[in-house]
Curated annotation (Swiss-Prot):
Protein name as catalogued: Cyclomaltodextrinase
Family annotation (CDD domains): AmyAc_CMD (cd11338), E_set_CDase_PDE_N (cd02857)
Temperature dependence: Optimum temperature is 50 degrees Celsius for hydrolysis of beta-cyclodextrin. It is elevated from 40 to 50 degrees Celsius by addition of Ca(2+), and the thermal activity is retained more than 80% at 60 degrees Celsius in the presence of Ca(2+). The optimum temperature is between 40-50 degrees Celsius for hydrolysis of soluble starch, and it is 50 degrees Celsius for hydrolysis of pullulan.
Keyword match Metal-binding: yes
E.C. number(s) listed in UniProt: 3.2.1.135, 3.2.1.54
GO biological process, one term: amylopectin catabolic process
Activity regulation annotation text: Hydrolysis of beta-cyclodextrin is inhibited by Cu(2+), Zn(2+) and Ag(+), and activated by Ca(2+), EGTA and EDTA. Activity is increased over twofold in the presence of 5 mM EDTA. Competitively inhibited by acarbose and methyl 6-amino-6-deoxy-alpha-D-glucopyranoside by reducing the rate of the ring opening step of the reaction.
Marked site (Transition state stabilizer) residue numbers: 421
Protein family according to the UniProt entry: Belongs to the glycosyl hydrolase 13 family.
Native organism taxonomy: Bacteria, Bacillati, Bacillota, Bacilli, Bacillales
Enzymatic reactions: cyclomaltodextrin + H2O = linear maltodextrin; Hydrolysis of pullulan to panose (6-alpha-D-glucosylmaltose)
Listed Pfam families: Alpha-amylase, Alpha-amylase_N, Malt_amylase_C
Cofactor binding annotation: Binds 1 Ca(2+) ion per subunit.
Molecular function per GO: calcium ion binding; cyclomaltodextrinase activity; D-glucose binding; identical protein binding; protein homodimerization activity
Length: 558
């Protein structure tokens, strides 16, 4: 046994309450080192009568390690536990202090989950597990009211998008096309920012309490939210709390009054006057963008202002949650207070952070419910679209992430394949719809909440920003009807089978130098086998004996 690789800690993703009665236990071992792993678990006050060996299953594997998991339901909501590691006939018992060659005589030195306190259980909104999101960039979705068009608005779709052009998209345009969303089958919408700003993307907020007049007003948003709710569609708005815009009145005051401004501590200012020297602003910003000064969210007045805005739009319009821009650059303390305020306003609100990398520190139940799952995006693109990862590497990329988060976080992770910040999926696939369909099929049959970027379903293409922000095509003769029907099919498939949303996931085939995968999604009602060939040539796969016990074991698939 390679005991140096064995790892467990009684916290985070290794030992956590999945709900009010169940604890999930995980342990890491060297890849292919153990033939079996068990948790020995029981009540410390009734150890002799309650201790049992619980078999652990292999949750995931990466290049170096296997990750094992089991579920225990302690009758009194507390559990003492250790692990039995087995390599053939060799056995080791792992306690909190050491490895033993014999079973521990008493539970004193075992690990402990002291008590499942309901208030401490990380519980994302249940509805998100069943959600299928559709992302809308409002300025480019539909122009429903030409009276609010900004000066210089171009005719719809008459030119390629630029960083500064406007086409007149607005909230009324979304209202006018809700039938399209219902026909597609989505049940949640995420809007990029709607609040008053100078740009077409609105990530430079001027007023956090006003809908940009270009899009409509608060009443229009309220009408849109109500109409969406009537159709069973949830609504998520974008909050830009890392930075404001240059026209944000407190920043304008600092520009005007400098050291005398009562708002100078609302921002991270290194020197006055505010200026840009050799391309670097004298104040902190998003990236080095002078139009986006970074907010000091530790300042009590800033904190109060932003938290009031977060609560205001939930109470005034009934939105179902927030997506948080540049969330990883804002303090954890602020996000903890944000969660408290938002969940008080709507306990069922979904809090989604924009974090592009490993995110476990935000997913412990005190900050976000989920993050935008770009590591998932990268894995899917590497395997299906760019074909720079083989099946084994693909499974490793996903396995490492799956083992890194508690299950309830994985169930609501925001799984996207493209967005307003990336090239469109069809463009990345070089127009190959076969690749695109495989990627989408995996997205809809994997853990997490899938999101469709507006227009993907009708064949919209486009490179990186601003190319990915084209006007939505509303001429149905130009729609890719085959692609639209495919999206409808995978949406119906996911909605019809709970196993695809919350069931277990297991790769059956994901081999080195292979472009074929097979995996199972399984719950008490369904066992769903998914087989994909990401190669132009045909292949035959066989489910190996012992990989799964059931009717499909030993099946040959061509």
């Amino acid at each position: 046994m390679f005991l140096e690789a064995v790892y467990h800690r009684p916290r985070k993703n290794w030992s956590y309450a999945y709900n009010g009665t169940t604890v999930h236990l995980r342990i890491r071992t060297k890849k292919d080192d153990m033939t079996a792993v068990y948790a020995l678990a029981g009540d410390k006050y009734m150890w002799d009568h309650t201790m049992e060996y619980v078999p652990m299953t292999k949750l995931a594997t990466d290049e170096l390690f296997d990750y094992w998991e089991c579920e225990v339901t302690p009758p009194y909501r507390r559990v003492k536990y250790g692990f039995l590691l087995q390599q053939g006939h060799e056995k080791r018992w792992m306690t909190e202090y050491d490895f033993l060659t014999e079973p521990p005589r008493n539970p004193d030195r075992l690990f402990e989950y002291p008590f499942i306190n309901p208030v401490d259980v990380f519980q994302p909104p249940a509805w998100v597990k069943d959600a299928i999101f559709y992302q809308i960039f409002p300025e480019r979705f539909a122009n429903g009211d030409t009276r609010n068009d900004p000066e210089g608005t171009l005719p719809w779709g008459s030119a390629d998008p630029t960083p500064s052009c406007f086409f007149g998209g607005d909230l009324q345009g979304v209202i006018d096309h809700l039938d399209h969303l219902s026909k597609l089958g989505v049940n949640a919408v995420y809007f990029t920012p709607l609040f008053k700003a100078t740009t077409n993307h609105k990530y430079d907020t001027e007023d956090y309490f006003q809908i940009d007049p270009q899009f409509g007003d608060k009443d229009t948003l309220k009408k849109l939210v109500d109409l969406c709710h009537e159709r069973g569609i949830r609504v998520l708005l974008d909050a830009v709390f890392n930075h404001s815009g240059r026209t944000f009145p407190p920043f304008v005051d600092v520009l005007k009054n400098g050291e005398k401004s009562k708002y100078k501590d609302w921002f991270h200012i290194r020197s006055l006057p505010l200026e840009v020297v050799d391309g670097i602003p004298t104040y902190d910003t998003f990236a080095f963008e002078p139009l986006m000064p970074k907010l000091n969210t530790e300042h009590p007045d800033v904190k109060e202002y932003l938290l009031k805005a977060a609560e205001y739009w939930i109470r005034e319009t009934g939105i179902d949650g927030w997506r948080l821009d540049v969330a990883n650059e804002v303090s954890h303390q602020f996000w903890r207070e944000f969660r408290r305020v938002v969940k008080q306003a709507n306990p069922d609100a979904y809090i989604l952070g924009e974090v592009w990398h490993e995110s476990s520190i935000w997913l412990e139940g005190d900050q976000f419910d989920a993050v935008m799952n770009y590591p998932f995006t990268n894995a899917v693109l590497d395997f299906f679209i760019h074909q720079i990862a083989d099946a084994e590497k693909f499974s490793f990329m996903l396995g490492k992430q799956l083992a890194g988060y508690p299950r309830q976080a994985s169930e609501v992770m925001f799984n996207l394949l493209d967005s307003h910040d990336t090239a469109r999926l069809l463009t990345q696939a070089d127009g190959d719809k076969r690749k695109m369909k495989l990627a989408v099929l995996f997205q809809f049959t994997y853990f997490g909440t899938p999101c469709i970027y507006y227009g993907d379903e009708v064949g919209l293409d486009g490179g990186h920003d601003p190319g990915c922000r084209k006007c939505m095509e509303w001429d149905e003769t130009k729609h890719d009807k085959d692609l639209f029907a495919f999206y409808q099919t995978v949406i119906r498939l996911r909605q019809a089978h709970a196993a695809l949303r919350t069931g277990t996931f297991k790769f059956l085939t994901a081999e080195k130098n292979s472009r074929q995968i097979a995996y199972l999604r399984e719950d008490d009602q369904d066992t769903i086998l998914v087989v994909m060939n990401n190669d132009k040539a045909g292949h035959t796969l066989r489910c190996l004996s012992g990989m799964h016990s059931g009717p499909i074991c030993g099946t040959t698939m061509s």
